[in-house]
Amino acid sequence: MAKALQGVMAALLTPFDHQQQLDSESLRRLVRFNIGQGIDGLYVGGSTGEAFVQSLAEREQVLEIVAEEAKGKITLIAHVGTVSTAESQQLASAAKRYGFDAVSAVTPFYYPFSFEEHCDHYRAIIDSADGLPMVVYNIPALSGVKLTLDQINTLVTLPGVSALKQTSGDLFQMEQIRRAHPDLVLYNGYDEIFASGLLAGADGGIGSTYNIMGWRYQGIVQALREGDVAKAQRLQTECNKVIDLLIKTGVFRGLKTVLHYMDVVSVPLCRKPFAPVDEKYLPALKALAQQLMEEKA
């Protein structure tokens, strides 16, 4: 299973319609688009998927739709993290029922939980996942939970934990984790340092911008396998030019707008309180969509 979890995993967006409801047809198209661009798997229901502005029922519905489109074709990881252990367990059970390959959970946030409470939270989710491997999700910039290296080392050795999504930007820590846990599946979480993360020991990555240019990230992986660091850096630079624009527009709404211009997503809106993309960026996003479609073809 560890080998199946390695690779380039798109952190899947969740399309909504003009009434702010789940757009299931756009979601299906997006899943098929990602499969078509050659990614290894999907990370469903995470930060990029706007999970924390959805109800549990909606999150389960997303898992069900994605499984219908992609089960058995690519690796599927269900992010089931919430502040509530019971709700995370419910989502983990759903992931097992729908045939996902693994579950993942961000550290419980908002309240100042003790580290042992974090460990108990993960143990409970692992139990409810009924044999599915756990991917611990470390994203201190958004969760507010700043784990020490010793705490990370403890979490990744809990029974049932197979992988870590490391979204911290600390490449030294990435290398330290790899050195301490050679068999752990380690994901780079920040797209803008993907190549550097691989060189620091990551097995692959989970990222938002893979939704629109996953083939570029696969190209980085292949270049490094062939020892062509210069090519990997050139591809990373091309990815980062896109990321520069998306940071200005707002990453999730910018991605949805590009996918709208690619005829994948019908409505390029995130769920409120996220605002729409500022109209001044629309020409640049449309040009980007055209460039990527030509490159992919």
UniProtKB/Swiss-Prot annotation:
It comes from Salmonella typhimurium (strain LT2 / SGSC1412 / ATCC 700720). The gene is nanA. Pfam families: DHDPS. It catalyses: aceneuramate = aldehydo-N-acetyl-D-mannosamine + pyruvate. Aceneuramate binds at residues 47-48, 167, 189, 191-192, 208. SUPFAM superfamilies: Aldolase. The keyword Endoplasmic reticulum does not apply. SMART domains: DHDPS. Gene3D superfamilies: Aldolase class I. This is N-acetylneuraminate lyase. It is an enzyme of class 4 (lyase). The active site is at 137 (proton donor), 165 (schiff-base intermediate with substrate). CDD domains: NAL. NCBIfam families: nanA, PRK04147.1. Its EC number is 4.1.3.3. GO terms for biological process: carbohydrate metabolic process; N-acetylneuraminate catabolic process. Catalyzes the reversible aldol cleavage of N-acetylneuraminic acid (sialic acid; Neu5Ac) to form pyruvate and N-acetylmannosamine (ManNAc) via a Schiff base intermediate. It comes from the Bacteria. Keywords: Carbohydrate metabolism, Cytoplasm, Lyase, Schiff base. The lineage of its organism: Bacteria, Pseudomonadati, Pseudomonadota, Gammaproteobacteria, Enterobacterales. Belongs to the DapA family. NanA subfamily.
